Amino acid sequence: LTRALEIYIAEFVGGIIVSKRSTDIENLNPDHVLSFNYSDTYEKIYGKEKKIKYDYIHGKANINKNVKTSNLVLGIDEYLNDERKDSELEFLVFKKFYQRVYKSTDNDYLNWIDRISDEYANYIENKNNMLESYRNSHNSVMKHIYLVSAKEKIPKHNLYIFGHSLDITDRDVLRLFI
């Protein structure tokens, strides 16, 4: 069934010619795209000639794959409470988290999150150092330099979500970004 969906997406959806574009999306210049979709629609329509890193977290439809090599993830949410989820494993293979691991879908997004966290930690550390230097300085010119440096803005990372149902089955990934 999953392979049939993959063929449909790769052949039919992939063959649709798009004549209209959203200028709102077109004017974005992302460095990274985390796709929960199986098709490369965004990449084909908006990502041409841009240096964007893509991560297809639920796999990417590919006509050249087969039943064994297909990495599309179709799954359910963890619906059991904490006591039962580790002991009742009969539906484990249907859960999205398990399938993402088992099918080795992309997880580059974890590196992206680490980089954002590191940038923020460095920003905070630099701010603390500047403020400490400001407090300890007796030279008014240096105090001014430290104060101006302390006003440096926090690194900005924008998150745009489109084409996603925001279903609870993907909350583990979305929570990392939000």
Annotate each PLM feature:
Residues 1-139:
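Extended, H/D-rich, highly charged conserved domains that either
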